[in-house]
Amino acid sequence: MQNFNYPHLSYWQKEIQNRDFEHNRNAQPSRLCAVDVIKAISNYTKTLLPIVATEVGQHQVAVVNNFEINEPRKLLTSGGFGAMGFGFPAAIGACVWQDKFPVICITGDGSFQMNLPELAVCMDYNLPVKVFIINNGSLGLVRQLQEEQCEERYFETAISSPDYVKLSQSYGIDAIRVDKHCDIMPALECAFKNKSPFVVEFMTVSDEKV
């Protein structure tokens, strides 16, 4: 927000900049949380000025609260409609539209299953989209709502997923899986050194709150 100057909003801008977005994430050193992953991606790509597309869910909230984006038209997200399946096609479109900035798709294991066959488009046209899957084994935002507003009466939020690494590789796309904090940065280095599409699956906790 430092690049925008709206005097009548100065108090609110200061409030946002000073606000601590750390929520109860049930964080433990041995557990990988989505917020930690998002912050790591943001820090790594700060000088790359990426275009960031998100799907819909907890990862989307984590991106909005923790990913540093200081330029217009750099965040593509379905905020009003909340349409799962929006982010990956949006990232592909951004890649087709321009090649100056890297394009990132941050998605969840639920949302990615809406449009994962589009991996074929990335491969066919060699679109270097970096897909980061936050896999918590659930529809996390719905689960959080059921926990907080429905007295933990969980219903249809735990989901099964394919092996995203093998699935990506079956399309001819390189992919790796990360389940430890120490492996986040090496995975990002590997993804961005690769000039082709690349998938990283982050295995995160299922009880995180954002």
What feature does the model see in each segment?
Residues 1, 62-210:
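Thiamine diphosphate
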Residues 13-89, 94:
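Active-site diphosphate/adenylate-binding microenvironment
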Residues 1-11:
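Glycine-rich, acidic loop regions that bind phosphate or pyrophosphate groups
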Residues 5, 30-33, 39, 163, ...:
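A diffuse structural propensity rather than consistent per-protein peaks
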Residues 10-13, 20, 143, 192:
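Generic low-complexity, intrinsically disordered sequence content enriched
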